[in-house]
């Protein structure tokens, strides 16, 4: 199966590059998959800096070995659709897989280029290629005020049109049950699947709690900072945490959001020098495991959210307790994936401090939360996630073959009922690859409805 993965990809510093890396790495493990990554051109990233505040330079970021990467589109460019389509036509893949948020191709300050890029999946399908989108948020869940967007009504009109364009793809997967409900209800479509974000380890290793609290009890905040992911409340809360837990240390890692260059550096400059706060900046992928293994608690200090949390899933991978803002998306994520998360009132530094102190004071609570999160991570490894995508793609290849060549009907039916790639296993992108149990369910009140099949030929 030939797959083109359209995504930001390391060493790019742009949003979702890490997720695309883990998807690509897992796809490479499947010998029947021929993967080509259609990635963004490398640039100097003023918003992504190291611990010294130095910007990441394109010339200093070598390509990752072992991947077939074609850098054929540029962030913020109007030529993105043409360049992508020309490359796709030349490669003739079986599947074109887009890994997207609404700002994947341009910032809100450049809406025409953003819309041009986001129209590419519809154009890809129109050219006859099976096209799938993994959409990490839906615009209806975005707090535009927190994200710093002006002209909100006009922007919502534009993003409504953009969403309809995205839904012209053969299939779209979202990562929260509420997001699927929004798209199916508001836009009257049936090609939306519920998938899982996944944890990034193919073979998870149980947490080693002896690496934590020796000697520091580390609080980790990691992400792309400056819009709805903000550090002010955490900085206000930390002195109270330190007073109660003298061994506490705060680590702030990650880059600025690409629209907020210099944000975390300004936060760093405002902190008293005596506080045990370490600002690490952008963390290379190879340093992520040790960062999480030595973390006592992950904190999600957000003002709002736009989807499932990548850092929360990494915390599950390494068995780390989580303290997060009490946001509906996070509540849904924790309930749907059985995560252990202690919530604090959004913007309330005192409540945040109390929740962190409660976790850090109790080794038993840290172990209990860590083990529950690790168990949740075992249910949704990236290997299971990718296998379910591949089953879905194979199923749609069978459907296409049935229509184009009726002679294939009997062999397809034999495969269908053999169980190896059949409907029973391919029906939901959120299935657990280790069992027949289905976790991918749409929540409506207290009831759960299974995801319907999408007909890619409709």
Segment roles from a protein language model:
Residues 341-349, 357-363:
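Conserved acidic donor-binding segment of nucleotide-sugar-dependent glycosyltransferases
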Residues 292-307, 320:
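Acidic donor-binding loop of glycosyltransferase active sites
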Residues 264-289:
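Nucleotide-activated donor-binding/catalytic signature segment of Leloir-type glycosyltransferases, i.e.
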Residues 4-5, 211-229, 235-238, 251:
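Conserved donor-binding/catalytic core segment of Leloir-type glycosyltransferases
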Residues 155, 162-205:
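Donor nucleotide-sugar binding/catalytic pocket of nucleotide-sugar-dependent glycosyltransferases
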Residues 365-379, 391:
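A short, well-ordered alpha-helix in the C-terminal region of glycosyltransferases
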Residues 116-126, 152-171:
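Membrane-proximal helix-turn-helix segments that form the acceptor-binding/catalytic region
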Residues 41-45, 249-265, 281:
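Glycosyltransferase donor-sugar binding loop
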């Amino acid at each position: 199966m030939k797959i083109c993965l359209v995504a930001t990809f390391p060493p790019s510093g742009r949003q979702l590059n890490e997720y695309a890396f883990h998807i690509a790495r897992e796809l490479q493990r499947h010998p029947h998959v021929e993967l080509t990554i259609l990635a963004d051109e490398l640039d100097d990233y003023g918003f992504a800096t190291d611990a010294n505040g130095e910007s990441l330079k394109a010339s200093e970021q070598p390509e990752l070995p072992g991947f077939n990467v074609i850098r054929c589109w540029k962030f913020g460019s109007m030529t993105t659709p043409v360049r992508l389509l020309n490359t796709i036509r030349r490669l003739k893949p079986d599947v074109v897989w887009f890994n997207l948020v609404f700002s994947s191709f341009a910032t809100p300050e450049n809406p025409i280029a953003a819309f041009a890029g986001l129209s590419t999946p519809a154009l890809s399908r129109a050219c006859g290629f099976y096209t799938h989108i993994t959409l990490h948020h839906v615009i209806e869940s975005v707090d535009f005020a927190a994200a710093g967007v002006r002209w909100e009504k006009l922007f919502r009109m534009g993003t409504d049109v953009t969403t309809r364009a995205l839904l012209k793809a053969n299939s779209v997967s979202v990562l929260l049950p509420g997001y699927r409900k929004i798209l199916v209800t508001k836009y009257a479509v049936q090609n939306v699947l519920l998938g899982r974000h996944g944890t990034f380890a193919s073979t998870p290793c149980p947490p080693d709690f002896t690496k934590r609290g020796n000697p520091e009890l580390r609080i980790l905040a990691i992400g792309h900072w400056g819009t709805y992911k903000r550090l002010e409340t955490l900085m206000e809360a930390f002195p109270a945490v330190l007073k109660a837990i003298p061994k506490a240390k705060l680590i702030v890692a990650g880059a600025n959001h690409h629209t907020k260059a210099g944000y975390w550096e300004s936060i760093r400059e405002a902190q008293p020098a005596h506080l045990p706060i370490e600002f690490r900046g952008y963390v290379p992928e190879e340093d992520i495991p040790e960062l999480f293994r030595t973390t006592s608690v992950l904190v999600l200090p957000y003002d709002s959210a736009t989807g499932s949390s990548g850092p929360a899933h990494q915390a599950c991978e390494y068995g780390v307790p989580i303290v997060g803002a009490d946001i509906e998306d996070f509540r849904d994520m924790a309930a749907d994936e059985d995560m252990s998360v202690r919530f604090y009132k959004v913007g309330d530094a005192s409540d945040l401090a109390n929740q962190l102190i409660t976790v850090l004071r109790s080794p038993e609570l840290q172990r209990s939360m860590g083990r529950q999160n690790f168990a949740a991570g075992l249910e949704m490894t990236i290997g299971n996630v990718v296998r379910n995508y591949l089953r879905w793609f194979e199923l749609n290849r069978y459907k296409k073959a049935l229509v184009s060549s009726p002679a294939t009907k009997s062999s397809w039916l034999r495969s269908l009922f053999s169980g190896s790639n059949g409907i029973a296993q391919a029906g939901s992108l959120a299935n657990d690859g280790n069992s027949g149990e289905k976790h991918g369910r749409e929540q409506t009140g207290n009831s759960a409805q299974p995801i319907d099949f999408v007909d890619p030929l409709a």
